[in-house]
Regions:
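Intrinsic disorder/low-complexity signal
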Residues: 3, 22-24
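Bacterial N-terminal signal peptides
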Residues: 9-20
Length: 289
């Protein structure tokens, strides 16, 4: 369960850097299309830097407050590191570097210029593939980003899609990321993070679900976690999903949020648009089984 591992142990660390990484990124003046690889629930992008002849492998991760470069990759490529920083995470302290200035591109698209360098070796091990970095919420801000899970394409749209009210919900942009409101099992509205770095469908913070109704699943990261699993009914805007696989948490993953919406759910709509400019999360009109 890659998303839980990241959120509980790694991205709490990234959160403290978000305020320093909100420099505006200019929106594309015209639509731009980039290839993605949707593999085992995660979205991969090839990134080029002057220091490497081979492309680097980054995860597209709207749930990360800031973009990250793998410290191991940065050292291997001789990229100049910023000052050491001690980053407090849940139950541990990480050592990283900030800022790490990097001229990075995805094809012809210029990517954020400053990164937090952290050791992502645990994530790489869980993915069975080197994770050289993460494109976080700073990549999405002030942009209209369309993710096509079926065609494995990312498009930066010049303008917000027209006539989206029926298949969209309000998207709130916060310092630490993006969130939307959902109803779980017919309950009251709760805020959850929109997290393209989460491979699973839904992670829910609750103390109400009886333990006897749950199974368990291990999440391996900086530490091993046993995550209770259940099925819930989830309503988001005009959409109601009856049986959503859900990981249960007693403590908040992020302050002010009751969980995460991951690729396991978002991909069911085929196409999802994160319109940070207009503050809308737009779903494809056709559900994909």
């Amino acid at each position: 369960m890659l998303c839980v591992r990241l959120r509980v142990r790694l991205f709490c660390a990234i959160l403290m850097f978000a305020a320093r990484l909100l420099q505006a990124e200019s929106s594309a003046s015209a639509a731009c299309e980039l290839p993605l690889q949707f593999r085992e629930g995660l979205l991969w992008m090839e990134v080029t830097v002057p220091q490497s002849k081979e492309p680097l492998h980054f995860l597209l991760d709207s749930g990360a407050s800031a973009s990250v470069v793998n410290l191991i990759a940065a050292k291997r490529l001789g990229i100049a590191l910023g000052p050491k920083v001690s980053v407090k995470a849940v139950g541990t302290t990480l050592t990283g570097h900030y800022p790490v200035k990097l001229s990075a591109r995805a094809e012809q698209l210029e990517l954020p210029g400053e990164y937090l360098a952290l050791d992502l070796s645990s994530l790489s091990g869980a993915c069975n593939r080197s994770v050289d970095g993460l494109l976080g919420a700073d990549f999405f801000r002030d942009r209209v980003v369309e993710i096509n899970y079926i065609a494995e394409k990312l498009r930066l749209l010049a303008v917000s899609p027209a006539d989206t009210c029926r298949n969209s919900v309000p998207l709130e942009s916060r310092l630490c990321g993006f969130r939307v409101a959902v109803n779980v099992n017919g309950g009251k509205r709760q805020w959850v993070r929109v997290d393209t770095g989460c491979a699973t469908a839904f992670q829910w913070v609750t103390s109400k679900e009886p333990a006897e109704r749950c199974t368990s699943k291990m999440a391996v990261g900086l530490s091993e976690l046993s995550i209770p699993q259940t099925m819930v009914g989830l309503r988001i805007g005009n959409h109601h999903l009856d049986t959503v696989p859900t990981g249960l948490h007693r403590k908040a993953i992020f302050s002010g949020e009751s969980g995460l919406l991951g690729n396991g759910l978002l991909a069911q709509f085929g196409v999802v648009t994160i319109d940070a400019r207009a503050g809308r999360l737009i779903f494809g009109s056709v559900r994909v089984d």
